[in-house]
Amino acid sequence: AKRIVERGENNMKTKTTAKVLGAALLTMTLARTATVYAEEEYTIGIEQFAEHGSLDNCREGFLEGLKEEGIEEGKNLSVEYKNAAADMGTCGQISDGFAADKVDLMVGIATPSAQSLYNAAMDAGIPVIYTAVTDPLAAELADDEGNPVGEITGTSDKLPVKQQLEMIRQMLPEAETIGIMYTTSEANSEAAVKEYEELAGEYDFKIETAGIATTADIPLAAQSLLEKVDCMTNLTDNTVVSSLPTILEMANEKKIPVFGSEIEQVKLGCLAAEGLDYIELGKQTGKMAAQVLKGEKKASELPFETIEEASLYVNTAAAEKLEIEIPEEMTETAAEVFEEITEA
């Protein structure tokens, strides 16, 4: 009996030792795996179509979104950032440069940049993530069901047109005609104009438009448009928004209010906007990019995403300059009220 007990004890000791060694080996393996993962480094190329607040916020939010997923500039992320200064030729040069550099991921901020990057990335086999693309279908970056047309996906900043029209009607009960300036080569802008024209009648508005090709066209187009309208509303049109101070100066001289499409435009002096938070949009995009970089998903497996909820922003300083009284209920329910105009 004594011999059996000893043998059992030895067996127990052997099993215990094996468990300890196994646990140690597993710990070492996990640690080694974690070290390898931590040492994974990425290089991305970010192309931003133009320099203005909403697109800057997208870029800021994008990097924050990556950081929240463990991918941080200066640690395991190298960023090549280029601004196209609203020039399509420059877009192509930047895109080709990223392809030649064989970056791990291309990021397009605004529609022209997204389209340009995708054209360069198709042959290079590099995935593309975009943000601030109002209509991915019109831009031919997604199919009719919202699925990617290739290794490209991202987030849309589709305008809340109904909410904007409701807000304008509430703020300007006597207004009849809304003016919209847009870039004729931007598919997103054309789609947004069409939606405004389709919905305007529901709120007893008419839409008057002015198409432009470059920023050089804006002063003359604005002058003509301001003669025909009671107010203007902006799209997320990059060429127009980059010249917003010029438009506001001309409109203010005629006491014609200009409504924005997001928070940064309201800060600059637009009367109000039903708009998106572009930092949050950027964060959402960064999290999508992290999935692609880590190999968890292919870009082609991720349908584009949107932020559904719009927020009201108003500028009381702009209202005072225009001699317009903003309804109290609007200032009370606004996500943010600005009491001064920020210099561009």
Predicted regions and their residues:
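Compositionally biased, low-complexity repeat tracts
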Residues: I4-V5, A18, E41
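Short, Lys/Arg-enriched N-terminal segments with co-localized hydrophobic residues
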Residues: A1-N11
